[in-house]
Amino acid sequence: IRDQITNYFCYISGTKIEISPYNVNIRAFGSFSHAAHRILMSATTQDDSFFVKGLDFSPEAVKNPLRNMSPKWSGEKMLIIPSLVDDSCDHDLIVTEFCRIQTSKFGMIALVPSTKNCKQYQNLGAIITTAESIFEELDNLKKGEFSKIVVINNRYDGIDLPDESCRVLILDSLPYFDSLADRYEEQACPNSELINKRIAQKIEQGIGRGVRGEKDYCAILVIGSELVRFMRSIATNKFF
């Protein structure tokens, strides 16, 4: 940073300062930039331009990716929007009814975007995970220790909930961006297609948490007016 300070942005909020590059000098990392083979795998990539601008890949490599011409069945997801099934099945009803369940034969997970969104679940006795407890709670589910619904705060990737550990996944409310840089872009360009692609990518990542294999399956409930509107809008449903 010291040697290339002009290539960085600085964002300041009420709680933190964030410094991030707008032009990464990827060639400074020889083990990556000079590698004979570089393979990137993602199921949810929405913006291929990052590979060229951010990772210094050639446009030809991005235009001609390796393709699996015989993909396997990747599990089954049943996507349900309760508010479209019946007007009475609103956000509060879904949260309340699932929090009433004290024992279950399978894991139930709610993904929420912030601590604020956890409050209703917490008041109704759900298990709220923290940075310290999340992996212990997920291990309990994988061991078959099912009880109340488990709430995960702003973790749309990096966690696996296979088989019985998650048969019901509640995707609650529109995801937030983590970084100040992304939040600034969202506020400055609220209708940007690139921003909408990033939001859609987070949603897709969340949807994929409960199905991790070709024989896996999960019911996914989508609640929260902003999230439902985003997924159904003519301008944004093309990303799914």
PLM regions: where:
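Short, low-complexity, polybasic intrinsically disordered segments
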Residues: 230-240
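A contiguous, basic/glycine-rich beta-loop/short-helix subdomain that forms a polymer-engagement track
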Residues: 1-92, 126-138, 152
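Short glycine-/polar-rich loops that comprise or flank the Walker A/P-loop
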Residues: 34-36, 74-77, 105-106, 163-167, ...
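Conserved RecA-like P-loop NTPase helicase motor core
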Residues: 84-87, 140-230
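Short, basic/hydrophobic alpha-helical segments
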Residues: 92-103, 140
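Short active-site oxyanion
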Residues: 35-39, 104-109, 146-148
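Short, polar loop motifs at secondary-structure junctions
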Residues: 44-46, 113-117, 153-156
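Conserved strand-helix element at the start of the C-terminal RecA-like helicase core
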Residues: 101-123
